[in-house]
Amino acid sequence: MPLHIVDKHKSLYDNYVQSATTEEIAKFKLADDPNEPETIKKLIMDELLLDGNSKQNLATFCQTDLDKNIHSIMDKCIDKNMIDKDEYPQSAEIENRCLHILADLWNAPDSSDTIGCSTTGSSEAAMLGGLALKWNWRENRKKLGLPYDKPNIVTGPVQICWHKFALYFDIEIREIPMENGRYVMNSEEVLKRVDENTIGVIPTLGVTFTLQYEDVFSISNALDKFEKESGINIPIHVDAASGGFVAPFIQQEIIWDFRLPRVKSINASGHKFGLSPLGVGWVVWREKKDLHKDLVFNVNYLGGNMSTFSLNFSRPGGQIIAQYYNFLRHGRNGYTLIQDACAQQGIFIGKELKKMGIFDLIYDGTGALPGVCWTISKNLPSEPLFNLYDLSEKLRSRGWQVASYSLPSSMNDVVVSRVVIRHGFSRDLSSLFVKDVQNAIEYFQKHPILRSLEKDEGENFHH
């Protein structure tokens, strides 16, 4: 073993006189020798300064404003593995409480008779909901002696997890394209696409592209009528990744959840408007019978018998405990105050953007998710001196991260920008953002762009 002379005086003096910081470190392979932990921590934290400021990240749906108690909970739970329910029985009990709270929040007919599970996020939760649809449809087809080799789902413009689900599990996705003036699915378009092989219809409560809600109520009514005429019973799974923690508090008049008998399952993201740290999603079934028993595995090699349904295995427990903390801390009234405050900022920004006379609002912040979505008006007297990719790039120089992207499929020629308003975004910040947008427009007027950014250069669509 080689001997190394350590200059203790230098190592104790300053992090920035040690070799780990004065020389190039190994970045793509494991170094031979260890380093002082504080020096390496400092080096990494310096690199992370190049990341964007999360408070100004208006592109993400994920929660970035977390109180000190959540940080403490996450620290205390860093070693808890949620799959080890026999070793961490109280953590498992807390997970169970969260599921029943959600079942009650989403108006399950009997929240004590429902079933569900936590996940790493709403994408995994959505896939589990989709798998349950497939298994139930396949069993029904087998009982009737009918073929079951061509399952399909009918969706609006969905988040990419549904395309992954369709590809990974060999299911046809019938995605209803947007049209000018219609950016979400509606019941008429659904009925054009459903048939005996449709395992489920997947409306989204908060479409990623525009923040709008799809009308679960009218879709359910249309499927009721379709069943009376055809005898084909098609269930609904609601992708409420964002809206599942918004609509129950500030849009209670919207009927989208288990109040509709056709809604068999709902997924949501705890780390979006559920106010929890990254890494927790939820899926809840209307009744236990809606989750096919063949999808549930029973394992006993962790010290006790337990049931599991997931696409992974080991998972940290801190996010689930933090979700429970949020439920207890905020309650219904607290969540209502928070989500309404977010919604008001979105409405304010929408009104201010409209006043500028250059933008058309696709979504003005009312009636769905907190935020706003806009495009450059096509009715301007002359061509604008910039595009939305240019605007996003200019705003980035002030620290703002704004998602700009083209809409999918048949609306691909329409470029939009979107901001999502999350807990922790004040009216003061909203006003500063609007001012920076106005300043950017004035800058482009004084300094015309010779070549605007193209889609592949400027698109920054954050799911």
From Swiss-Prot:
GO cellular component: cytosol
E.C. number: 4.1.1.15
Coiled-coil annotated residue ranges, if any: none
GO MF terms held by the record: glutamate decarboxylase activity; pyridoxal phosphate binding
Reactions it catalyzes: L-glutamate + H(+) = 4-aminobutanoate + CO2
InterPro entries: Glutamate_decarboxylase, PyrdxlP-dep_de-COase, PyrdxlP-dep_Trfase, PyrdxlP-dep_Trfase_major
GO terms, biological process: aggregation involved in sorocarp development; glutamate catabolic process
Keywords: Lyase, Pyridoxal phosphate
Family, similarity comment: Belongs to the group II decarboxylase family.
The protein's assembly and partners: Homohexamer.
Protein name per its UniProtKB record: Glutamate decarboxylase B
